[in-house]
């Protein structure tokens, strides 16, 4: 999809690209392979979170978003805001697969002087905000959506954030503003994987979906590792007008690699090369 096709780009009753579930699952697998390559070259990283949201990223970048990798600053592009900047490996993999990034940059991921840092920077083509300090992505996404409205631009803004991040009060201030202004071109995707830096979540934020509903958001909760459910959530929310939208994703950190799925301290993975080789093999063995 390029900027030359923008005048027939908005079909409110359908996706940007109508890919089937099998194609989307293959895209998700390729994202996981790409992330594993990047993490094993580095020897460490936030790989578990990236694997957990791979299915969502496959749907968003291959079915939902309108963008032009040859023109990253195209004003009419849909915007994907990664609030959890440490999930950068997932976004870089998606941008590479979408044609934004050259392959050689993947091999330098996270190294000193690399274009692709462990946390996102907005000087990378396709990266909309600089990440790092949590709790700020949704507010920036709200600002983008308001700016689009002022410009009579019907582009969408999709913001990914995490369950741990919901402990930040700024998230709920932003949610309140979005509801007040009826920003129905804004979608929040909340990755609920149950982990924080040192292990499981330390503050109970449940019921997550009910909170977003109470703030006036049209909300759907799904299995975040089930592509069929993710697609159905986007299709259902597409018909909701006059309210911002939220998808609550229940994901498994390390999805697709049983060793990582069972790892309690999965926030930051650091293992030897032999174990990386085993993890690569597990990923291929568990692909169905």
What are these model-derived regions, one by one?
Residues 2-31:
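N-terminal hydrophobic or amphipathic helices/low-complexity stretches enriched
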Residues 98, 204, 261-265:
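Short secondary-structure boundary/capping segments
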Residues 38, 51-180:
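Cofactor-binding active-site loop characterized by glycine-rich and histidine/acidic residues
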Residues 55, 86-87, 193-194, 226, ...:
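Glycine-rich beta-alpha junction loops
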Residues 28-44, 191-192:
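N-terminal capping segment at the start of a domain
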